[in-house]
Structure formats: C-alpha cells, structure tokens
C-alpha cells in the first residue's frame, strides 16, 4: 500500500471516529426516544395550561374583592347610596297619597357598581297600617331604572296617570265621567267596615280649614296641594305632571321626615320639594307622572302659600257616606276597604 492509500485510510477512520463520537454525544444529550420526547413535550404543554389557569383564577380572585371594594367606595363617597335612598323615600311621601314607609322594611343590595333598593309601602286604613306592596328600584351606578311596583291593592293607582284617571281632581279641572258611581260603591259597602276615600273639593282651602270640615270620626291622611299646574296637569311639553302633597298627620317614628320634631308638616313638605329639585332627574324616575317642574311649582308655593284641593281620608264607612251632603265636597273616589278596626 502506497503512502497515498495509507493517508486516505487514516482519513476514513478519522471521519468514522468523528461520526461515532457525534452520534454518541447526541445520544448522551438526548437519551430519550421519539415517543418519550413527545410525552415530555405534552407534559410541558399540560403544565403550561395549568399554570395559565391558576394565574387566571388568581387574577379573578383578586379582581372580585377589588371590584367589590371599589363599588362600596363609589356608593359611600359623597353619600351616594344614602342620597338615592332618601330621594326614593321622600318621593313616596309627597307623590303617593296615603302611602308611608318603615325603616326596618327597606333593604339595599349592592352588586358590581349597581344597587338594588327594595322597600315595603304601607297605607293607613281605619286605624291600622297595612302593608300594601313593595317597590324595587335597580340602579346602574347612580342611574335608576323605573320602579317595579308589586302592589296588593283592590284599587291601585294607575302606573301612568292622566287627567281621566286622577283620583284627586282640582276645582278647575273636569271630573271624570265614571266618578258619579263612587257614591253608589260607598253606599253598597257593609257598615262594619272602614274605608279610604279620595275627596276632591269645590274650592281651594287652607290645610287647617279643611281638617275642620271633617268630624272627629274621620281622619285626614294626605293633602293634595295646589301648585299652579293641577287644573290641566300637563307641562309645557304636554307631559303629565305628578300630583304633590304631604301627610296631614304627625308620624312619630324617627324614620319619617314628618315626625313633627323640629318642623311642622308644611315646612317639611317645602324642604322636601327643594331637596327633590336638586335631584329632579332621579325623582322623575321614581314618580308615576313623568314631569315634575319643581322649580316652577316651588316658586308658586312661595308666592301663594299652601292651599289644598283634595285630601285622602279614612274612617268608618257609615261616617264617610255623610260626606255626600257636605257642601265642600265635589267628588270622591273610593280606595281600599278593610274590616272594622275603629276604636
């Protein structure tokens, strides 16, 4: 073998050695076969998925308390929640005849930047207060939806009032045609009952003057106040204007704004109107009529004083029948009736 051949043989051996060493090195670095490598890759993928899930759950678990805390802070700062509750409750007192609330019957449920207010409403019929339903109002941030009224009344107020369905009629407004049947309804009730009656007057009267017109066996519960718009009950845009009034009697519960401690009911009524004027956009949502024009009506009351055109009264049914012969009564609307509870 010549020298050239020997060199070529050495080169081949060296090349084979390098190949063998490279294969051995690769096998040392990658000791797993293809199946095992796929299993390892899949295990890595599963581990990554689990890690992502755990991270997502951790973020969600962190978001929930942060959102909850932020919501409570939102409603707490500036007294937003209390203000919304106060607007809702005071709207009932001055727009819903013979309707009242009780503090312990009001609930608030706060969600993510939302609040749901639920409160029971009561009527005095005879000498007892009866629960007659509940109102539920959902708020997204501080924007309320229309109230959901769940009432258990025989003769509930209309959801969308109009001149034809108004229970208390101004002396300058036309009396609805069906109103003549109300005296027949009252006469047809058993003597052993107490009733609620909406009385419309022939003329405007002062609150004290009106109360003197009723005997001791009839209790005046709510006074409908003339604010300059009740003759037509529509505003400049043709929207029905909500009636306004206030409780005639002192409510000695601490919850009621008409508790008689610092102001008489007329003064409280005026204060409430001015408070609601500052929150009129929200108040309109709560009221049945979709217009309030509070600024105009407050100015009218300041200039002309408080005069009433109607009242809600309650008492023994036989006593209420006597109102038919009263010269100051223009028309009536019979409300709720209960079994005898007059003492």
Segment roles from a protein language model:
Residues 23-26, 201-205, 314-318:
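Short, flexible beta-strand-to-coil junctions
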Residues 54-72:
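Hydrophobic membrane-insertion alpha-helices, especially the h-region
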Residues 89-122:
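Short extracytoplasmic
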Residues 257-343:
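Extracytoplasmic/luminal low-complexity segments enriched in Pro/Gly and acidic/polar residues
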Residues 1-30:
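N-terminal targeting leaders characterized by basic, low-complexity, disordered sequences
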Residues 75-91:
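Ser/Thr/Pro/Gly-rich low-complexity linker/stalk segments immediately outside membranes or between
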Residues 125-254:
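Extracytoplasmic beta-rich ectodomain segments of secreted or membrane-anchored proteins
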Residues 34-48:
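Juxtamembrane low-complexity tails/linkers enriched in Ser/Thr-Pro and polybasic
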């Amino acid at each position: 073998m010549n020298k050239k051949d020997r060199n070529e043989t050495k080169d081949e051996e060296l090349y084979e050695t390098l190949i063998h060493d490279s294969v051995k090195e690769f096998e040392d670095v990658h000791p797993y076969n293809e199946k095992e490598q796929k299993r390892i890759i899949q295990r890595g993928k599963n581990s990554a998925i689990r890690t992502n899930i755990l991270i997502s759950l951790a973020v969600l678990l962190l978001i929930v308390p942060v959102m909850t805390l932020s919501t409570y802070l939102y409603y707490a700062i500036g007294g937003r929640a209390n203000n919304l509750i106060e607007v809702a409750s005071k709207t009932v007192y001055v727009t819903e005849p013979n309707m009242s609330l009780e503090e312990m019957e009001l609930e608030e449920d706060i969600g993510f930047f939302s609040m749901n207010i639920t409160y029971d409403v009561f009527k005095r019929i005879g000498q007892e207060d009866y629960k007659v339903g509940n109102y539920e109002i959902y708020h997204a941030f501080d924007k309320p939806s229309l109230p959901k009224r769940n009432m258990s009344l025989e003769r509930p107020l209309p959801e969308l009032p109009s001149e034809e369905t108004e229970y208390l009629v101004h002396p300058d407004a036309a009396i609805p045609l069906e109103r003549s049947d109300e005296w027949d309804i009252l006469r047809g009730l058993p003597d052993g009952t107490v009733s609620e009656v909406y009385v419309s007057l022939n003329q405007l009267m002062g609150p004290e003057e009106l109360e003197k017109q009723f005997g001791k066996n009839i209790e005046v519960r709510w006074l409908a106040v003339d604010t300059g718009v009740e003759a037509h009950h529509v505003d400049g845009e043709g929207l029905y204007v909500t009636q306004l009034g206030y409780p005639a009697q002192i409510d000695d519960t601490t919850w009621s704004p008409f508790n008689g401690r610092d102001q008489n009911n007329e003064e409280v009524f005026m204060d409430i109107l001015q408070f609601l004027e500052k929150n009129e956009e929200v108040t309109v949502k709560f009221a049945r009529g979709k217009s309030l024009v509070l600024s105009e009506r407050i100015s009218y009351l300041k200039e002309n004083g408080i005069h009433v055109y109607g009242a809600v009264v309650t008492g023994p049914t036989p006593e209420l029948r006597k109102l038919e012969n009263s010269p100051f009564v223009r028309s009536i609307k019979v409300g709720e009736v209960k079994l005898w509870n007059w003492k």
